[in-house]
């Protein structure tokens, strides 16, 4: 890893700023002054110090966000606010990205990380990682519709969705809410599944991903780091 990236990720400023620190002779690698920010170092085997203090290097960041409506699940956009725009400069220096996406009008659990391997495992169709949604529907839903959602319905392109789990929370006129758990992530899948049974989604929130649930203490737009236990659960093979 390049020295400037290590120092920037460890909170010593931008790459331009750490270049000045190195030039000032304040950075040591195994007791010897660093000469160039382009120098490669191994934080696992080499000791790097700045002004005599050991650098506590951290490679990855894992953030659980309650994504708000109206914000894009993207790293950048020239016209609209993205989930990364909600982060602090200290967190943005890790260059996190959303692991998967939620529609602009969808709220709920979104993982932001720079761990590409974890993101790939969570998003790979072969891994069958379950994702549970709270789905508010325009009309009441029948038991037959629930059965169809669970066995699979045909959506755009003639694709039949994989088996899902559907549970009715409330089924009153004007207040129909179901919990829907799917193991794939086709474009607008939940909305398309509702449409396939003659209904319409009016509000959508992702409650969980894998074995990790959204922290109820997080208001829309708020986020926190994953706990060690939550990270362990995300890394575990899915049943």
From Swiss-Prot:
InterPro entries to which the protein is assigned, alphabetical: PsdUridine_s_RsuA/RluB/E/F_cat, PsdUridine_synth_cat_dom_sf, PsdUridine_synth_RsuA/RluA, PsdUridine_synth_RsuA/RluB/E/F, PsdUridine_synth_RsuA/RluB_CS, RsuA_PseudoU_synthase, S4_RNA-bd, S4_RNA-bd_sf
PROSITE patterns listed in its UniProt record: PSI_RSU (PS01149), S4 (PS50889)
Residue stretches making up the S4 RNA-binding domain: 1-65
Gene3D superfamilies noted in UniProt: Alpha-L RNA-binding motif, Pseudouridine synthase I, catalytic domain, N-terminal subdomain, RNA-binding S4 domain
Pfam families: PseudoU_synth_2 (PF00849), S4 (PF01479)
Any GO BP annotation: enzyme-directed rRNA pseudouridine synthesis
Active site per UniProt: 103 (nucleophile)
Presence of the UniProt keyword Isomerase in the record: yes
EC number, as in UniProt: 5.4.99.-
CDD domains in the cross-refs: PseudoU_synth_RsuA, S4
Name of the protein in question: Uncharacterized RNA pseudouridine synthase YtzG
Organism name: Bacillus subtilis (strain 168)
One Gene Ontology term of the molecular function aspect: RNA binding
Statement: the UniProt record of this protein carries the keyword GTP-binding: no
Annotated keywords: Isomerase, RNA-binding
Segment forming the signal sequence: none
Reactions listed under catalytic activity: a uridine in RNA = a pseudouridine in RNA
Similarity section: Belongs to the pseudouridine synthase RsuA family.
Coiled coil: none
Principal EC category: isomerase
